[in-house]
Amino acid sequence: MAKSLRSKWKRKMRAEKRKKNAPKELSRLKSILKIDGDVLMKDVQEIATVVEPKHCQEKTQCVVKDETDDMKMETDIKRNKKTLLDQHGQYPIWMNQRQRKRLKAKRERKKGKSKVKAMKAAKGLTW
């Protein structure tokens, strides 16, 4: 379905508006975080000791690296790279119906040609 000029224009104008308002939005968000952050930090400091952010980042990076090593996904889906079919004969989710139909027809044409060749070869041998 084609995109109308109106929708293209509206999208363009929204993008320009976002560019124009981005600095204001950023400063507003920063001010909100600054106000709320100070209040929370004061409450936390009364209860417990606060660690500097650099130490926290280093520790979390080490923990994240360890977790990623352990979490390797095992995919049970095995695909034929040439036909893109999996072991159950299903195409990938991202492939649209027209592509699926086209590939299926192409595959059937190849099967038909091989059957015809086999029939001709068999006829040639029988006489």
Swiss-Prot record:
Instruction: Report the main location listed first in the record.
Output: nucleus
Is Nucleotide-binding a UniProt keyword of this protein?
no
Q: Name one Pfam family in it.
A: LLPH
UniProt record, GO biological process: dendrite extension
Keyword Acyltransferase carried by entry = no
Q: Where is this region: Disordered?
A: 1-24, 98-127
Q: What's in the GO CC field?
A: chromosome; nucleolus
- Composition skew (Basic residues), residue ranges: 1-21, 98-120
Protein's cellular compartments: Nucleus, Nucleolus; Chromosome
**Keywords from the named record:** Chromosome, Isopeptide bond, Nucleus, Ubl conjugation
The superkingdom of the source organism is Eukaryota
* GO terms for MF: basal RNA polymerase II transcription machinery binding
Region forming the signal peptide: none
Q: Which InterPro entries match?
A: LLPH-like
Cross-link Glycyl lysine isopeptide (Lys-Gly) (interchain with G-Cter in SUMO2) position reads K65, K72
Which purpose does this protein serve, as stated in its record?
Answer: In hippocampal neurons, regulates dendritic and spine growth and synaptic transmission.
State whether it acts alone or in a complex, and with which partners, per the record.
Interacts with CTCF, MYO1C and with the transcriptional machinery, including RNA polymerase II and TBP.
Family membership: Belongs to the learning-associated protein family.
> Can you name this protein?
Protein LLP homolog
- Its gene? LLPH
